[in-house]
């Protein structure tokens, strides 16, 4: 009976070893992640050496063992722990792409090395997806929301709660504000100066306007300025003013501009209106006739007539 029991256990062990060798467990993990593998061993192998090895072409390459050897350099990314009660646990952390391969738990018992469990590990390279961008946007939004909540609290310091970009933006806005204030002050000063100058110029025109003379430049004011009479002519020029426009008859057609002679003029056929004559003590060399009611700018004048050398001006009466 005992022989049959031992034979049955041996067959089960061989079957388990064959199944472990032929059908390894497939595990897929991304770069930087971790895996945890548990292996069951027999209770009679509790004191046996447990090994976590990588299966290569030349055989099992041990990575970590249950024996504590302080002289051998340990692997900082693979940990083997014997939990007792026939349970062995292996953990691989911070996986890299070169960790891809086939691994297994091996127990070196009295019957020889026995593979308890095999694992086919595939380490996937990192693939940036839209999820990472969404998480980054969510983090930025969370940072903005948190910053806004801190700023809304009046008990907190705004400069301490603001982020670096917000603080840099405030530093850049300070010179712009001062520049705008300086420009506004310059505009106000320019407007005030312009208003004062315009007021001074207006006062100068009001004071100097009536006293300006219409004389020729380079002449003295007394000699250049002439008082004008109501006819628009200077008072020192002899002229005749007629109350009404004269009729163009033979009286004016045959008139001469020669100096007055001693003989009295012939009496006119029709008595004209008495003209206003301004007598002058000087000899008259030209005459000016002004018609009332007409344009003052249109004045009939004649060329001056030179006196003969031997003629004598009769004395005025």
Curated annotation (Swiss-Prot):
Disulfide bonds join 39-105, 53-60. It comes from the Eukaryota. Residues 147-166, 212-278, 295-317 are annotated as: Disordered. It is a single-pass type I membrane protein. The modification Phosphoserine is found at residue 283. The chain crosses the membrane at residues 176-196. One of its GO terms (biological process) is wound healing. Residues 261-275 have a biased composition (Pro residues). Residues 197-317 are cytoplasmic. A motif (ITIM) lies at residues 284-289. Keywords: Cell membrane, Cytoplasm, Disulfide bond, Immunoglobulin domain, Lipoprotein, Membrane, Palmitate, Phosphoprotein, Receptor, Signal, Transmembrane, Transmembrane helix. Its main location: membrane. Residues 1-20 form the signal peptide. Residues 308-317 have a biased composition (Polar residues). One of its GO terms (molecular function) is signaling receptor activity. InterPro entries: Ig-like_dom_sf (IPR036179), Ig-like_fold (IPR013783), Ig_sub (IPR003599), Immune_rcpt_domain (IPR052314). The keyword Disulfide bond applies. Cell surface receptor that may play a role in the innate and adaptive immune response. When phosphorylated, interacts with PTPN11. When phosphorylated, interacts with PTPN6. This is Trem-like transcript 1 protein. It comes from Mus musculus.
């Amino acid at each position: 009976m005992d022989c049959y029991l031992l034979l049955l256990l041996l067959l089960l062990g061989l079957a388990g070893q064959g199944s472990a060798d032929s059908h390894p467990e497939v595990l897929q993990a991304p770069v930087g992640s971790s895996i945890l593998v548990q292996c069951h061993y027999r209770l009679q192998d509790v004191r046996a050496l447990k090994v976590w090895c990588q299966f290569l072409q030349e055989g099992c390459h041990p990575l970590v063992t249950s024996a504590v050897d302080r002289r051998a350099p340990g692997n900082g990314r693979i940990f083997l722990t014997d939990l007792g009660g026939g349970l062995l646990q292996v953990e691989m952390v911070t996986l890299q792409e070169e960790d891809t391969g086939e691994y297994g738990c091996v127990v070196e018992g009295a019957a020889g090395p026995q593979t308890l469990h095999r694992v086919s590990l595939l380490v996937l390279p990192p693939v940036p997806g839209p999820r990472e961008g969404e998480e980054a946007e969510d983090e930025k939004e969370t940072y903005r929301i948190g910053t806004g909540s801190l700023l809304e609290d009046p008990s907190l310091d705004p400069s301490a709660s603001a982020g670096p970009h917000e603080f840099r933006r405030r530093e850049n806005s300070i010179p712009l504000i001062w520049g705008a204030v300086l420009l506004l002050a310059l505009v106000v000063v320019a407007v005030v100066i312009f208003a004062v100058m315009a007021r001074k110029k207006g006062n100068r025109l009001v004071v100097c306007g009536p006293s300006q003379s219409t004389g020729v430049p380079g002449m003295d004011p007394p000699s250049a300025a002439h008082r004008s009479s109501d006819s628009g002519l200077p008072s020192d020029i002899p002229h005749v003013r007629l109350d009404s426009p004269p009729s163009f008859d033979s009286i004016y057609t045959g008139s001469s501009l020669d100096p007055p002679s001693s003989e009295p003029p012939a009496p006119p056929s029709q008595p004209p209106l008495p003209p206003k004559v301004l007598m002058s003590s000087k000899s008259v060399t030209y005459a000016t006739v002004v018609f009332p009611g007409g344009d003052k700018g249109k004045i009939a004048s004649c060329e001056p007539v030179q006196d003969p050398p031997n003629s004598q001006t009769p004395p005025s009466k």
